[in-house]
């Protein structure tokens, strides 16, 4: 039985360097792993969440985060704030970074 994901965000733009990999992908933390998925659900990359570095580039807009997986840096465009309950759209970049820290046991 699969555990409920600790964090899931849909509608996330995922890029690598200057290339967009998917405009409406999914970021999911479950079973101790962070997965980056395309809008069709195929895996772009995944890594144990302890090995992932998630941060907010200081010069980037509020909704942006970066995630380093397996030596590759991905740029993630989430929301600049959490959507209202029942509203579509990805959660905030800050919530993603907190979720990575919490899931990897680095405090929350």
Stretches with model-predicted labels:
Residues 1-28, 88-107:
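Anionic N-terminal interaction surfaces
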Residues 17-62:
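Phosphoinositide-binding peripheral membrane targeting modules
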